[in-house]
């Protein structure tokens, strides 16, 4: 399965994020994570 667009939520095919990070998903197998605004409010 491929990721959705860059603004799409994480899916099982691109499940690199949790409550503290967001996925930047692309049309491929590459996926990068970054801190989300809401996740930053809660320390890891």
Swiss-Prot record:
Keyword Secreted: yes
Localization per record: Secreted
Superkingdom: Eukaryota
Domains as described in the record: The presence of a 'disulfide through disulfide knot' structurally defines this protein as a knottin.
Disulphide-bonded residues: 3-17, 10-23, 16-33, 25-31
GO molecular function term, any single one: sodium channel regulator activity
Pfam families: D_CNTX
Source organism (scientific name): Ctenus ornatus
The protein's name: U9-ctenitoxin-Co1a
Function: Insecticidal neurotoxin that reversibly inhibits the N-methyl-D-aspartate (NMDA)-subtype of ionotropic glutamate receptor (GRIN) and inhibits inactivation of insect sodium channels (Nav). In vivo, is highly toxic to insects.
Statement: the UniProt record of this protein carries the keyword ATP-binding: no
Keyword line: Disulfide bond, Ion channel impairing toxin, Ionotropic glutamate receptor inhibitor, Knottin, Neurotoxin, Postsynaptic neurotoxin, Secreted, Toxin, Voltage-gated sodium channel impairing toxin
Tissue occurrence: Expressed by the venom gland.
Main location: secreted
A GO cellular component annotation in the UniProt record: host cell postsynaptic membrane
């Amino acid at each position: 399965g491929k990721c959705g667009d860059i603004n799409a939520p994480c899916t099982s095919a691109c499940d690199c994020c949790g409550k503290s990070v967001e996925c930047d998903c692309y049309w491929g197998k590459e996926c990068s994570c970054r801190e989300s605004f809401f996740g930053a409010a809660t320390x890891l």
